[in-house]
Amino acid sequence: MINLKELKILHTSDWHLGVTSWTSSRPVDRREELKKALDKVVEEAEKREVDLILLTGDLLHSRNNPSVVALHDLLDYLKRMMRTAPVVVLPGNHDWKGLKLFGNFVTSISSDITFVMSFEPVDVEAKRGQKVRILPFPYPDESEALRKNEGDFRFFLESRLNKLYEEALKKEDFAIFMGHFTVEGLAGYAGIEQGREIIINRALIPSVVDYAALGHIHSFREIQKQPLTIYPGSLIRIDFGEEADEKGAVFVELKRGEPPRYERIDASPLPLKTLYYKKIDTSALKSIRDFCRNFPGYVRVVYEEDSGILPDLMGEIDNLVKIERKSRREIEEVLRESPEEFKEELDKLDYFELFKEYLKKREENHEKLLKILDELLDEVKKSEA
């Protein structure tokens, strides 16, 4: 017997098909890594026998001129997903301006896919006949923002959200909100998306929906439990600001009268790692070569002082994709923002110098503490001599 009170969903987002990373230093086409991740997502959808697949934007990386290869891959994976369950696609800020025409073409050859290009609700039928009302909030058209001042644009967005709340009440079986924007408080997690942000207060997400599927933020985030609101994150680590991000898709189970349940699907992306050094000396060169030799992903080197020794490391090491010189202040800022991620690198940045700076900023009697620290360092140096 078909259970219309149950809905199994696979939610994925931010594929960025066609992306090439580190174009200014060592361009790396990420196609094969993305395809492996997408293969895993499709396999999980098949294995879990999902009823509906939600794609919340930025499927393509180039907004103006996606490659033929990227469009071919997009069509291929959409077709594979449609064989598993009906698919609903919401556009994002990166998505190609011609996506609407592309969507018209795809929907002309299959009724198992829906492209929601506006703020108007859409009713779809899931795999087992469940009636699902989709409440879409696509990334707003830039022309709309330009026609309005900031206050008017904010009112425009909030009025759309209020209307979607009213529309959610008209659901038959399930109501799902789909949005591509930044939830207030998460702007720092936008990764490569940083810039002009559409920021929405989470309280404005219609509370009567059964699930809120979001896209745009590249790391997994459970925003709230009522309604369950999730960013699944992108499938791969596109740049080094995403080193510690959890990547993948989300499997969601909805049952009428019960709280929703979900499970992360890890896409197993290649790792990224930043190595920090005070200066590139012979010891640092050995450390870089040794680390890169055994590291399965891509590496960035950041150093503070120019020592005059900087051979063609990128020509020598295939997975070293970026070498940057940064000021002490820039490096300290990174360490403050992600202390757990980079704590093992502190010794390469002259730990005691950083600690002295910390004392100056945080301790009123820092002069006395600095004197004690210097005395300890002198004793250590004498014992090592």
Swiss-Prot record:
It comes from the Bacteria. Mn(2+) 2 binds at residues 14, 58, 180, 216. It is an enzyme of class 3 (hydrolase). Its cofactor is Mn(2+). The lineage of its organism: Bacteria, Thermotogati, Thermotogota, Thermotogae, Thermotogales. This is DNA double-strand break repair protein Mre11. Belongs to the MRE11/RAD32 family. It comes from Thermotoga maritima (strain ATCC 43589 / DSM 3109 / JCM 10099 / NBRC 100826 / MSB8). The gene is mre11. Keywords: DNA recombination, DNA replication, Endonuclease, Exonuclease, Hydrolase, Metal-binding, Nuclease.
